[in-house]
Amino acid sequence: EGQAATTDVDVNAAYDGSGATYEAYKAFWNRDSYNNAGAALISSVHYSTNYCNAYWNGTQMVYGDGNVSQGCQPLARGQDVTAHELTHAVTENESGLIYSGESGGLNEAMSDIFGAFTEAYVDGGKTGTLTVSADTWKIGEDILAPALRYMNDPAADGASKDFYVAGVGNVDVHYSSGIANLAFYLLSQGGTHPRGKSAINVT
């Protein structure tokens, strides 16, 4: 960190997003990078053509440029996306959560949760205060409007699950993650199930 900006907006976004994610983990959890041993955070941008995705490949971040004609912006420009993918690296280093079935849903939820956390850290001015807004609970709202997923109301995307049922492990992990995402939202913010599937008010 600390280097001058380049002329490439997406290089700058990946650089700043990775830096903010590192800072958030360090400030709140005293974690030194994804391996807790100071590993460098490496990113590649402009991957492929019309590629609306980003991923952790086991050693570094990879960002597509999106597909603007279909409303998908360059992936490096989403702070929660960067933190989400880097959290996959943390999970890879710290847990045995395989990337399939119910375990995969928890893996994805962990990334969404820390994506939201890091966004709140940045919105709080990176001062140690978390600023939470309606956008905090939207995943990828800066990439594909109105959002990719909704932690406070997972079913709003038309696919994510918001309560446990038998066989949920057969659902795409990006959608089964909604169960843990909503649990985290309710634990941190309080309230009831957004679609009336429980009568318990979490306080």
Could you tell me what each predicted segment is?
Residues 85-91:
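Surface-exposed extracellular loop regions of Gram-negative outer-membrane beta-barrel proteins
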Residues 1-8:
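Acidic/histidine-rich, surface-exposed loop or edge segments in extracytoplasmic proteins
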Residues 8-80, 91-203:
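Zinc-dependent metallohydrolase catalytic domains
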